[in-house]
Amino acid sequence: MAKKQTEGYMSAKESRRISKENRKITNQFEKQRKRKNVPESEYLTTMHDPQNAVEFDNLHTYFFTDTGTVKSVDGVTFDVPIGKTVGVVGESGCGKSVTSLSLMQLIQRPQGQIVEGEIRLNLGNGKAYDIVKTPQEQMQHLRGNYVSMIFQEPMTSLNPVFR
């Protein structure tokens, strides 16, 4: 009798084990993110160059799935100077959108998490926030007021009636 080929397949038991481990990891990140009344000093930072609007420094954004961890963004570093346009170019699936969504803290949670690095946002009043450490409560204030995004399908996001 021929032996069943299992190479490339994962058992249900292994999938449950990975899923349980990943849930523990994501729960820790979510607990940190959802804290209330966090003192500003915990996410206040300084820009490496005050002429930058945003600084990505060694950003790692991972997705914790039932079958393992997907390292979607793994060590990205770049700056966006104030008043300048920066194009992020790469192959399909290389992490361009996930990098931008990380800045907005809009990655799919709880599976998607920023696990390492800094994203420094210059607020223009001598203050800068490390977006990675900024709690959800504060991010709601920052989105739209200090940072915004036009998504990949602009026709579904932009209304030509509003100028």
What are these language model-derived features?
Residues 1-163:
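ABC transporter nucleotide-binding domains
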